[in-house]
């Protein structure tokens, strides 16, 4: 069996948007990202190894985004869909150039193994490290929590700045055991992080069957079997209130989530948002204010913004 491979040369600005679009809208079997910055940082990440950039084949100027589809998928239709999406993202002021798209077919077994070469240990903080299941790792500190992860076919490996901002927000908020809702869980990484950091209970929601499966499998990989999983759109049909609501999703979807927060957040609860491009921050700020929420902390990594949010108090 072969897979249809769509490669897009673009920028860091649109990585999350392309991954979400490919997985959720186009139902890609999987996605992969090759970032120039990953190779430039290789010395810091991997025992100070010296990397000659000229020796790396087909190194992207910034980002090479790859999506995999069933062999029977119409390549021309997929190219058109991605071109339209890039045009839409450019309309938001995001950098999409060069925007070159190429098509190829690869053997199925290549997808299952080759992409893992680009995914390594991430020492997120003093208290958290993200470790792919196929790598050995000894914690940097005795009490450092390890999140074992096989991202499989779901969105969220821990590599991207938006995921890391969300995890740092969870770590900051978790000063005592909290009830947590992870909205748009993807691979389950944020739900697992909350559990590892001492959450009282965790609910993970997503609209995708693939995400539900990946989150359950990744939780089991970490010996966790009590994260509640619910297939739903955002917090629709979710019962109860939570001390902490976390969402690392696109700004346009966060705008749909904001009106749902009040009925699902405990009185003194907190909200962590990530996935916000700085150009879209004003829209989020306005929507939060209109729904009686305030921003307590802004975090930034590159052009991405993370927010710690609570109710306004007179």
UniProtKB/Swiss-Prot annotation:
Q: Which SUPFAM superfamilies match?
A: S-adenosyl-L-methionine-dependent methyltransferases
Q: Which reaction does it catalyse?
A: L-lysyl-[protein] + 3 S-adenosyl-L-methionine = N(6),N(6),N(6)-trimethyl-L-lysyl-[protein] + 3 S-adenosyl-L-homocysteine + 3 H(+)
Q: Which InterPro entries match?
A: Ribosomal_L11_MeTrfase_PrmA, Ribosomal_PrmA_MeTrfase, SAM-dependent_MTases_sf
| Cellular localization per UniProt | Cytoplasm
Database matches in Pfam families: PrmA
Q: Which GO terms describe its biological process?
A: methylation
Q: Which GO terms describe its molecular function?
A: protein-lysine N-methyltransferase activity
Q: Which domain of life is it from?
A: Bacteria
Matches recorded under Gene3D superfamilies: Vaccinia Virus protein VP39
Q: Name one GO cellular component term.
A: cytoplasm
Q: Where does S-adenosyl-L-methionine bind?
A: 163, 184, 206, 248
Q: Which HAMAP family match?
A: Methyltr_PrmA
NCBIfam families recorded for this chain? prmA
> Any idea what job this protein has?
Methylates ribosomal protein L11.
Q: Which family does it belong to?
A: Belongs to the methyltransferase superfamily. PrmA family.
Name of protein: Ribosomal protein L11 methyltransferase
Q: Which organism is it from?
A: Lactobacillus delbrueckii subsp. bulgaricus (strain ATCC 11842 / DSM 20081 / BCRC 10696 / JCM 1002 / NBRC 13953 / NCIMB 11778 / NCTC 12712 / WDCM 00102 / Lb 14)
Which gene underlies this protein? Answer: prmA
């Amino acid at each position: 069996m072969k897979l249809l491979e769509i490669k897009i040369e673009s920028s860091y600005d649109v990585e999350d948007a392309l991954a979400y679009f490919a997985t959720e809208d186009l139902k890609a079997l999987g996605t992969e990202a090759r970032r120039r910055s990953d190779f430039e940082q290789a010395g810091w990440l991997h025992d100070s190894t010296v990397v000659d950039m000229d020796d790396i084949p087909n190194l992207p100027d910034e980002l090479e985004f790859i999506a995999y589809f069933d062999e029977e998928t119409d390549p021309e239709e997929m190219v058109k869909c991605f071109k339209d999406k890039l045009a839409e993202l450019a309309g938001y002021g995001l950098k999409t150039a060069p925007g070159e798209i190429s098509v190829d077919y690869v053997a199925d077994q290549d997808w299952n193994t080759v992409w893992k070469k680009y995914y390594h240990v991430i020492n997120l903080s003093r208290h958290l490290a993200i470790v792919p299941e196929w790598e050995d790792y000894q914690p940097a500190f005795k009490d450092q929590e390890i999140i074992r992860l096989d991202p499989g076919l779901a969105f969220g490996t821990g590599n991207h700045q938006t995921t890391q901002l969300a995890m740092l927000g969870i770590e900051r908020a978790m000063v005592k055991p909290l009830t947590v809702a992870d909205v748009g869980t993807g691979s389950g990484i944020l739900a697992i992080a909350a559990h590892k950091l001492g959450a009282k209970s965790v609910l993970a929601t997503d609209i995708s069957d693939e995400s539900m499966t990946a989150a359950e499998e990744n939780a089991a990989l970490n010996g966790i079997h009590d994260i509640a999983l619910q297939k739903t759109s955002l917090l629709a049909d979710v019962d109860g209130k939570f001390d902490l609501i976390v969402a690392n999703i696109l700004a346009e979807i966060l705008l749909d989530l904001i009106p749902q927060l009040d009925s699902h957040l405990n009185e003194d609860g907190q909200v962590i948002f990530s996935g916000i491009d700085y150009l879209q921050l004003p829209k989020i700020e306005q929507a939060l204010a209109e729904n009686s929420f305030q921003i307590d902390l802004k975090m930034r990594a590159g052009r991405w913004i993370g927010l710690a949010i609570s109710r306004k108090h007179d």
